[in-house]
């Protein structure tokens, strides 16, 4: 049976991007569903991949699951089928309600400008992509926040040159060892790399002489933080969902918009750009200072929380009640 929400999302994207090449890279379905989809949507390219399954592992009596490999396979196969120079990668449970993103793609890729930056400069040594990639900032973690994950772009939306997006997803599939307990004073997680981190770190590895630029969560130094920031500011530009007319309903309905204080905003990116690329003083607005105080309070909360999570029975109860991913 076809998901009605998916059909609604597909219709919205088609109406906002008329004349564009639309590719849906998904999993094998029954023949009658394939036939109906291709009959009703002759302007859409459907790719039905063989489902390679998820990765799972039991730790502390809890089963942890990641669909990382599914994302890699479906995204890569969709991108490799594109005949266009520019591509936008989104999830099938998300949609665009307008086409503002086209304006920003034109500004960045054709005019090489953004906001008040007339000509965007980059540090060649840290350029993984040929041009900047637009990154929806949901889950694009700021390592100075209360969720200090490095090399963590958001994986909900990428937009840029098709060749650059292919670089990001033309990587080896992950193995079960990616799931492991990682503990620090600041946080506890059960993945060496989150899906977002894995694709980015593996992508960088290809241009870094086969060496990992980052060894995994919570095992890092201040220089690793600097590298994470430099690689992000030279390859991605974060955009809020409203800026680009984009909606991923699951973030509010499933995650309850948690982590909003932990993600990169445009003013964060501008300050990284000033600090590393053009070497000018960082400027903090009143809003940024207020947000900094809120992040400090969240860090205190997480410190107390993580002290409690060191007890196994507390971890098991907490993850069963509250963890939404996997």
Map each language-model feature to its residues.
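Catalytic phosphate/metal-binding cores of nucleic-acid and nucleotide-processing enzymes, i.e., regions
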Residues: 24, 71-74, 105-112
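Active-site-proximal specificity loops/subdomain of glycosyltransferases
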Residues: 25-81
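Membrane-proximal basic amphipathic "stem/tether" segments
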Residues: 257-326
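A short acidic (Asp/Glu
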Residues: 6-8, 33-36, 59, 98-105, ...
């Amino acid at each position: 049976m076809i998901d009605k929400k998916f059909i609604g999302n597909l219709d919205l994207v088609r109406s906002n991007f008329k004349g564009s090449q639309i590719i849906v890279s998904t999993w094998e379905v029954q023949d009658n569903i394939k036939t109906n989809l291709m009959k009703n949507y002759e302007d859409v390219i459907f790719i039905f991949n063989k489902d390679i399954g998820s990765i799972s592992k039991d730790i502390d009596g809890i089963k942890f699951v990641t669909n990382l490999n599914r994302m890699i396979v479906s995204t890569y196969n969709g991108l490799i089928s594109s005949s266009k120079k520019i591509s936008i990668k989104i999830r099938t449970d998300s949609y665009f309600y307008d086409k503002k993103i086209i304006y920003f793609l034109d500004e960045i890729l054709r005019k090489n400008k953004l906001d008040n930056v007339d000509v965007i400069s980059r540090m060649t040594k840290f350029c993984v992509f040929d041009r900047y990639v637009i990154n929806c900032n949901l889950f694009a973690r700021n390592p100075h926040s209360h969720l200090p994950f490095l090399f963590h772009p958001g994986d909900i939306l990428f937009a840029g040159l098709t060749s650059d997006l292919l670089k990001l997803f033309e990587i080896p599939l992950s193995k079960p060892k990616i799931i492991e307990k990682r503990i620090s004073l600041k946080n506890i997680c059960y993945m060496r790399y989150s899906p977002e981190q894995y694709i980015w770190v593996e992508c960088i590895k290809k241009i870094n002489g086969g060496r990992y630029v980052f060894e995994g969560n919570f095992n890092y130094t201040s220089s690793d933080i600097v590298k994470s920031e430099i690689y992000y500011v030279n390859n991605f530009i974060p955009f809020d969902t409203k800026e680009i007319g984009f909606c991923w309903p699951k973030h509010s309905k499933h995650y309850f918009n948690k982590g909003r204080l932990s993600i990169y905003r445009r003013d964060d990116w501008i300050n990284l750009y000033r600090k590393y690329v053009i070497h000018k003083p960082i400027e903090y607005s009143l809003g940024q200072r207020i947000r900094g105080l809120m992040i400090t309070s969240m860090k205190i909360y997480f410190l107390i929380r993580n002290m409690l999570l060191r007890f196994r029975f507390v971890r098991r109860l907490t993850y069963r009640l509250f963890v939404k991913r996997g």
